[in-house]
Amino acid sequence: MTLREYILFWQETYDKHQSRPTTYAAHNYVFKNHILPSLGDIPLSELTSEMVGDFLEGRRRFGNHRPGSSGLGEETMRHIHRLLQQCLDQAIRDGLLTENPAKAFRYRKSTTVKANIMTPLEMEDYLDAAERLGYLPMFMLALTTGLRQGELIALKWSDLDIENRTLTIAENRAVVRRELVEYGSQTRTIALTPEVIDLLIREHDKHPSSPLMFMHPATLKPYSPQMVRRMHDEIIKEAGIDHIRYVDLRHTCAILALKNGVDTKELAQMLGHYRPTITRQNYEPYLPHKVQKDEDIPNEATQSELICSLHERQ
């Protein structure tokens, strides 16, 4: 049995039934585009730690399998490594291997996220550009709440409580092939500012019959993550801040919250982190030992109120 044959077996037998649909799709992408082209034809019983190490080092240096191409980022490398280990661990339980050849490779783990924190001027330019392009409600919501892309595109109007100014995030809802899929009931609730509520009410008036908060105007289906990235790329190009990634909206929201006195437990709940220690590890290195209030930031402002105050609209 080759590694390719076992991976296909593992996907159908285990991964498809144990992972979320979006996670399963992401795993399939990694296997197809990274692991199988290099290691797929090797007999499973002949796979060695040296082969795995050479493969991972090659992906680190040449991400697209050929010299001259740019290497893979640290997060992608760790994801590939973990996935291969997970698959081979099951091969041991299935009695096909006695040890995991992927475990000998040690890839340095980063202790913090790599974040480009937006300045007040960059936030204002970003929101100005989003408004000119017609994308303001979606990206104002993203910047003021730190929502992940997948959470943003899966929102429904029934998640919004206008009276209490809150939004309930269905953490087990996802967009798969442009359709909403729900596979659990875990939720978290976050507060919204009056400015964001007003924007969302006006957005609802544009398509009141749709259950989706944000949808593609031509297909009336949810946006895909790729579409959100393209819209974000349009915004940063229009604003002239090309170094800002979508994930930096989330990082900016988190850092501003901490600077304004939100504790890590509360921030972890808002961001959907499993443990506050993850939040602390990710973001506290970006702050002074004793957090001082930025002179540009009103002391009484929450992270959402701060960002909204930068760009008041009628």
Residue ranges and their predicted role:
Residues R93, M140, T144-E151, M227, ...:
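C-terminal catalytic core of tyrosine-transesterase DNA break-rejoin enzymes
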Residues N172, T193-I241:
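Active-site/catalytic core of tyrosine-dependent DNA strand-transfer enzymes
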Residues D159-T166, V262-N282, I307-L310:
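Short, polar N-cap/turn motifs at the start of nucleic acid-interacting alpha helices
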Residues L8-P21, K32-K114, D128-A129, E203, ...:
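N-terminal core-binding DNA-recognition domain of tyrosine recombinases/integrases
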